[in-house]
From Swiss-Prot:
Acts specifically as a functional antagonist of AGTR1 (angiotensin-2 type 1 receptor), although it up-regulates AGTR1 receptor levels. Positive regulation of AGTR1 levels occurs through activation of the G-proteins GNA11 and GNAQ, and stimulation of the protein kinase C signaling cascade. The antagonist effect on AGTR1 function is probably due to AGTR1 being physically altered by MAS1. Receptor for angiotensin 1-7. It comes from Mus musculus. This is Proto-oncogene Mas. It holds the Pfam family 7tm_1. The keyword NAD does not apply. Interacts with AGTR1. Interacts with FLNA (via filamin repeat 21); increases PKA-mediated phosphorylation of FLNA. GO terms for cellular component: plasma membrane.
Amino acid sequence: MDQSNMTSLAEEKAMNTSSRNASLGSSHPPIPIVHWVIMSISPLGFVENGILLWFLCFRMRRNPFTVYITHLSIADISLLFCIFILSIDYALDYELSSGHHYTIVTLSVTFLFGYNTGLYLLTAISVERCLSVLYPIWYRCHRPKHQSAFVCALLWALSCLVTTMEYVMCIDSGEESHSRSDCRAVIIFIAILSFLVFTPLMLVSSTILVVKIRKNTWASHSSKLYIVIMVTIIIFLIFAMPMRVLYLLYYEYWSAFGNLHNISLLFSTINSSANPFIYFFVGSSKKKRFRESLKVVLTRAFKDEMQPRRQEGNGNTVSIETVV
């Protein structure tokens, strides 16, 4: 794999730099409008997710769902931070020195790390809510207390492993034939994991969830929570999923798909920035929108009527991980 493809932004910057050096006196090429939009949206999304993370960590009691949302916000924050710095770097058009080059690579890898984690977490959210509807007794009485935290830790570890494989085999590889074959193997593995495991799980569990909710009137009590889940997944599939497809194609067909890189980054930025807006508008009361405290709005959006319960020694049941 040609090392000039270590990051798509680095590739574009190198091409722009060489083009200017070849034509003396040429003016600085205009920054694509897409990068201006990214540099406008990503700080807003970063602040939104930061505020959301602060409320989830310090102002609200946790339930199984908010544990996942907390980790999803961390993944979105890391993604938005990296994409903002990459866009600023592209706009300033620094020379690609060795140290600067690897800084860009580090940011790009962290960006992929946040993206992969977001996909895995959304799948876990969808699957767990589906299980809570299919097996309500297990969910309320027998679900392990720290299952959400344990699943999140496993998914972060899986994301780290997948991202490291992608970096070592595809981004930081040389031009040797064995490196190219190793990269193809990693691409196939990631494609199977993303499009034949996690995405189908997300779609199937979401479909089952919608069907079960429509058939059960009791689900209306926590309908806002299900709306949050469904809208978040739909936004992810529309805006974020194309980026993974393009990134896998870049490694082999950069010349054909490289021009779509900026659009895929913009879509991914929109996805990560949209989540806090989804939580706010779904949790807001139509009659009191913009007049309620953020804590009240988030509590309503994340309220879980099917709170897990735990058996005590005296035979009584008590609720755990309730939301204020």
